[in-house]
Amino acid sequence: MDCGMENCNGGISNGDVLGKHEKLIIDTDPGIDDSMAILMAFQTPELEILGLTTVFGNVSTQDATRNALLLCEIAGFPDVPVAEGSSEPLKGGIPRVADFVHGKNGLGDVSLPPPSRKKSEKSAAEFLDEKVEEYPGEVTILALGPLTNLALAIKRDSSFASKVKKIVILGGAFFSLGNVNPAAEANIYGDPEAADVVFTSGADITVVGINITTQLKLSDDDLLELGNCKGKHSKLISDMCKFYRDWHVKSDGVYGVYLHDPVSFVAVVRPDLFTYKKGVVRVETQGICVGHTLMDQGLKRWNGSNPWVGYSPISVAWTVDVEGVLEYVKAKLMKP
């Protein structure tokens, strides 16, 4: 297996590395940084957003659905369907909800009116399966929360992994500290069983871990500039980020905000701004390291079978053009 470094370059150095009307579904738990990524996506004319699917994580699934509906309306795309997903992990139990990071409403406790329209009658897994069946080989999924909905879609349709074009995932901490505990990143920790199902499904997967996303932040000066500019959504995002920024100061000593979800969105539209390594990734589902993502880089020939053998490798973001990604994100967030 060749697990060397690769640069996924779409051949375009400026702008979005996409054809017209690239089909995208965003699986999300909005969430302040999710909101940034979603609004950026709606401001990318090369994308045809087929829908949003919702999951627990930054908020409960019900609140994620409300926020997704609101964001579609704020972006000016009220007819984009929002399909509600699972309210609990694959194995059941109480979901982990990080409202202490994103505020009780998930949007930094900024007061917004309720959405004017309702969610889809389809579940998230049904919606994902139907769209991938309708457009085989054409649909990219950007997964910004726990991977429960994708795992359920795979379990519903065994051909899902072969029909989806690509899955780009925010998740994992590769050879670095987690952000829930020393071992695990929040999205994977939220449903480790689901993550392992997805990572071993055989789908074309790119995963962007927090070892990448924590290299990029909006500083206090950037946030001030965002709030004062004439961007279409910049004032709203700036207001949301006040709560988010205060949590970063208390939790990490960071005077600003990390750009986890926006960076993962950039991996969809500008993959050339990252380098990748390929390898099989498994997720620990028990013990003190539950949620830990461990990659076999193919550096050693094992003498016997092990839990990594026999699965397809995925692409793990390895390095990032920090300046290039920041420039792209700020341009999108400040776009009139």
UniProtKB/Swiss-Prot annotation:
Pfam families: IU_nuc_hydro. GO terms for molecular function: adenosine nucleosidase activity; identical protein binding; inosine nucleosidase activity; protein heterodimerization activity; protein homodimerization activity; uridine nucleosidase activity; xanthosine nucleotidase activity. One of its GO terms (biological process) is purine nucleoside catabolic process. One of its GO terms (cellular component) is cytosol. The keyword Hydrolase applies. It is found in: Cytoplasm. Homodimer. Component of the NSH heterocomplex made of URH1/NSH1 and URH2/NSH2 which exhibits strong xanthosine nucleosidase activity. Interacts with URH2. Belongs to the IUNH family. This is Uridine nucleosidase 1. Its EC number is 3.2.2.3, 3.2.2.7, 3.2.2.2, 3.2.2.-. Keywords: Cytoplasm, Glycosidase, Hydrolase. InterPro entries: Inosine/uridine_hydrolase_dom, IUNH, Ribo_hydro-like. PANTHER family: INOSINE-URIDINE PREFERRING NUCLEOSIDE HYDROLASE, URIDINE NUCLEOSIDASE 1. The active site is at D29, H260. Disruption phenotype: Normal seedling germination and plant growth and development in standard conditions, despite an abnormal accumulation in the roots of uridine and of other pyrimidine metabolites as well as of xanthosine, but no accumulation of inosine. Accelerated senescence accompanied by marked accumulation of uridine and xanthosine under conditions of prolonged darkness leading to pale green/yellow plants due to increased chlorophyll degradation. The roots of the double mutant urh1 urh2 accumulates strong levels of xanthosine. It catalyses: uridine + H2O = D-ribose + uracil; xanthosine + H2O = D-ribose + xanthine; inosine + H2O = hypoxanthine + D-ribose; adenosine + H2O = D-ribose + adenine. Expressed ubiquitously in leaves, flowers, stems, pollen cells, root tip meristem and root vasculature. Involved in purine and pyrimidine breakdown rather than in pyrimidine salvage, especially in response to dark stress. Together with URH2, required for efficient inosine and xanthosine hydrolytic activities. Unable to use cytidine as a substrate. Can use uridine, inosine, adenosine as well as the cytokinin derivative isopentenyladenine-riboside as substrates. Also hydrolyzes xanthosine with high efficiency. CDD domains: nuc_hydro_CaPnhB (cd02650). Disulfide bonds: none annotated. Its main location: cytoplasm.
